[in-house]
């Protein structure tokens, strides 16, 4: 069994990045600011449980998230019951494995159908709202409370209170409002250039079914060991 490829979406500058893995060693090579570090950070955060930050959301998606917030700020807005609006905005990692029949016992939690007999298997890990209904309610309570307080103090001094937008709210409550969830992918729909839509109804029974299968170790850069421009002092 080995990792055949990964696809990183909506993570920092990596809007959609497909990476093929070799059977032995895979090296990321590229110019500065080309996304090498972002790719490695995505692997560490999704597969090793390292903490996310609001800045991990692709900048171009933040205005779209604020547009969702604008809808939520209307009094008559109905509580959402799905993540359909968020599907193309959230950081995600697709992991595609090549699994031999003798290794099936390692991946029983992500086998898509009883007809599967080996070969490609895929899992999508998404950093998503823990409960979209709860985020909706909590944001509206904070937003409307801030606006009421502003009105009450408007006669004395014009003030602007937190939160003014959904992104501003998430910057403060990101890790408490979001969590990694995993979804089984359909091997027959694999396309390196066009990732399949998330089937939110196919959530795995465990948050990370790849725990125990994939291990992430990081060796920090030892710049001073070989830097010819090293200076003392």
Regions found by a protein language model. Give the residues of each.
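Glycine-rich phosphate-binding loops of NTPases
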Residues: 58, 62-90, 96-233
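Non-catalytic alpha-helical coupling and interface elements of nucleotide-dependent molecular machines
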Residues: 44-52, 130, 224
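Pre-Walker A-like glycine/lysine-rich segment at the N-terminus of P-loop NTPase domains
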Residues: 1-49, 57-69, 81
């Amino acid at each position: 069994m080995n990792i055949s490829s990964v696809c990183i979406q909506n993570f920092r500058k990596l809007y959609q990045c497909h990476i093929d893995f070799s059977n032995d060693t895979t090296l990321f090579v590229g110019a500065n600011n080309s996304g090498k570090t972002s790719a490695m950070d995505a692997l560490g955060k999704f597969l090793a449980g390292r903490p996310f930050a609001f800045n991990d959301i692709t900048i171009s998606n933040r205005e779209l998230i604020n547009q969702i917030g604008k809808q939520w700020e209307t009094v008559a807005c109905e509580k959402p019951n799905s993540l359909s609006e968020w599907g193309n905005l959230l950081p995600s990692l697709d992991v595609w494995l090549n699994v031999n029949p003798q290794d099936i016992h390692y991946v029983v939690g992500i086998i898509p159908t009883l007809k599967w007999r080996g070969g490609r298997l895929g899992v999508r890990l998404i950093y998503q709202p823990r409960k979209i209904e709860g985020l909706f309610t909590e944001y509206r309570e904070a937003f409307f409370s801030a606006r009421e307080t502003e009105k009450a103090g408007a006669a004395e001094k014009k003030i602007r209170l937190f939160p003014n937008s959904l992104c501003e709210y998430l910057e403060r409550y990101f890790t408490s409002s979001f969590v990694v969830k995993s979804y089984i992918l359909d091997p027959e729909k694999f396309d390196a250039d066009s990732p399949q839509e998330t089937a939110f109804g196919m959530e795995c029974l465990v948050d990370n079914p790849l725990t125990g299968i994939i291990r992430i170790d990081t060796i920090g850069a030892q710049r001073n060991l070989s830097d010819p421009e090293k200076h003392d002092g």
